[in-house]
Design a protein with these regions (language model features):
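Bulky hydrophobic segments
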Residues: 1-123
């Protein structure tokens, strides 16, 4: 007998954890640390993009069934990357290659997690 590991509650937990990490980094960690080292600024800025992508993928996919999750996650990642590229033209921010990299890494890790979550396991 094969049992799928997929659960809406699991996807919700991962998504809400991603949102909590975004708020934690933005409103708690950044203000407490007054270090303006370039590496620190890059890591903190890109980590928000990373966790926001993870949150978007898992919260949106928690409302779908198991089929097509990888394709849906791929479209979400491409949408996040497209948004990063058009931000300067919309007047909403600046283009940052490190954010694109963080989004790509988050998408890869999320799709790997999704593929493991919906795979069948022998009991």
């Amino acid at each position: 007998v094969k049992l799928p590991i997929y659960s809406k509650a699991h996807y919700d937990r991962v998504g809400y954890t991603g949102i909590m990490m975004c708020f934690l980094i933005t409103y708690v960690v950044r203000p407490q640390l007054s270090i303006e080292l370039p590496v620190f600024v890059i890591v903190m800025g890109s980590s928000v993009s990373f966790f926001a992508t993870v949150a978007a993928i898992f919260l949106l996919l928690s409302h779908y069934n198991q089929r097509g999750n990888i394709v849906s996650a791929l479209f979400i990642v491409f949408g996040c990357m497209l948004y990063e590229c058009v931000q300067p033209y919309l007047g909403l921010g600046v283009f940052d290659i490190f954010d694109l990299t963080a989004i790509a890494i988050a998408g890869f890790i999320s799709m790997l997690g999704i593929s493991l979550a919906v795979s069948d396991v022998e009991p």
